[in-house]
């Protein structure tokens, strides 16, 4: 039996694409909020390792029961794995400082990626930046500044980390756009998962072998902490995160293959809305006024850039 979501789309299906996109961002926003919640119980490297193992199991089961294992072989391995490396670095910066910043700062920092895509499009893709894109960049810069609040006494590098994540996410988008358009969603997810697994294994080994100052370990236990005891609670969390991650990424990949990206991309920003809702449910937190205005500026900039690509 083959699932429709894995078949090659023969025509645009905007309603199906919209539903898939909303399901995808809903699942990923839930996962990302859960990761912040779990920073006191696990480490980034343990999380990546255990989650990746479960995702690999799910991928092979899905491939076996739907399209077969041939779909997992990339047509262009080098760009596929280069993109996966960009995503792995992106996640390192996105989750690395999660215990020190708000969920709103995490999400809005990551969603500066359309601004970086615009900046990188000229040197890497040969695209020209017109006045609308320049205005969007200015608006996005204002939003990022409001979000970072660099003049505050409590400002730290942790607040910059999600924006660096946005830069590497932009590299992923550009590689995907130029070299990976014909790859299967399962192929792309498999490559990402394999790279995440390697990052988890080598990161765990590095943290164990390299001697770090105890103050450094104490300030970033999620990133530099030793491998914690693998409890049933952590395993359940990693299994849940694996399911949410796989669901979210498959839905988003298929959504952008079954409708115009210029129509869907503005709706991608509903991730920030879902992230805010999950943050309220799990942490009882709501964004501050400056964070809210910053998010609005970043979303507006992304929408302007998207519509000018039509």
Residues covered by each model-derived region:
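Hydrophobic transmembrane alpha-helices of multi-pass small-molecule transport proteins
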Residues: 132-149, 290-309
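Transmembrane alpha-helical segments that form core, pore/gating elements
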Residues: 36, 59, 154-218, 224, ...
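Helix-helix packing/entry segments at the starts of transmembrane helices
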Residues: 50, 106-112, 180-195, 246-280
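Hydrophobic/small/kink-forming positions within alpha-helical transmembrane segments
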Residues: 25, 29-30, 60, 84, ...
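Membrane-interface interhelical linkers
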Residues: 1-26, 56-82, 131, 194, ...
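Hydrophobic/aromatic residues within transmembrane alpha-helices
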Residues: 38, 47, 97, 103, ...
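C-terminal transmembrane-helix exit sites in multi-pass transporters
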Residues: 113-135, 273-292
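Glycine-/small-residue-enriched transmembrane alpha-helix faces in small-molecule transporters
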Residues: 2-46, 154-178
């Amino acid at each position: 039996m083959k699932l429709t979501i894995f078949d090659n789309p023969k025509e645009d299906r905007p309603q199906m694409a919209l539903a898939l996109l909303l399901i995808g961002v809903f699942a990923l926003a839930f996962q990302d909020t859960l990761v912040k919640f779990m920073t006191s119980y696990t480490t980034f490297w343990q999380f990546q390792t255990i989650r990746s193992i479960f995702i690999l199991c799910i991928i092979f089961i899905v491939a076996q029961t739907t399209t077969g294992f041939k779909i997992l072989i990339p047509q262009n391995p080098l760009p596929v794995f280069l993109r996966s490396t960009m995503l792995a670095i992106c996640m390192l910066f996105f989750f690395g400082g999660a215990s020190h910043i708000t969920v709103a700062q995490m999400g809005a920092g990551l969603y500066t990626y359309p601004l970086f895509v615009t900046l990188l499009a000229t040197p890497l893709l040969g695209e020209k930046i017109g006045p609308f894109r320049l205005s969007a960049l200015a608006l996005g810069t204002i939003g990022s500044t409001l979000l970072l609040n660099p003049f505050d006494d409590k400002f730290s590098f942790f607040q910059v980390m999600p924006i660096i994540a946005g830069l590497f996410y932009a590299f992923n988008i550009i590689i995907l756009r130029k070299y990976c358009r014909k790859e299967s969603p399962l192929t792309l997810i498999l490559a990402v998962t394999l790279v995440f697994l390697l990052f988890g294994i080598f990161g765990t080994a590095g943290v164990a072998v390299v001697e770090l100052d105890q103050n450094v370990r104490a300030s970033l236990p999620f990133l530099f902490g030793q491998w914690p005891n693998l409890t049933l609670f952590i395993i359940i969390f990693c299994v849940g995160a694996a399911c949410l991650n796989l669901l979210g990424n498959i839905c988003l990949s298929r959504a952008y293959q079954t409708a115009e990206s210029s129509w869907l991309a503005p709706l991608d920003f509903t991730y920030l809305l879902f992230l805010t809702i999950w943050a309220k449910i799990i942490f009882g937190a709501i964004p501050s006024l400056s964070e809210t205005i910053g998010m609005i500026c970043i979303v507006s900039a992304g929408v302007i850039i998207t519509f000018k690509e039509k």
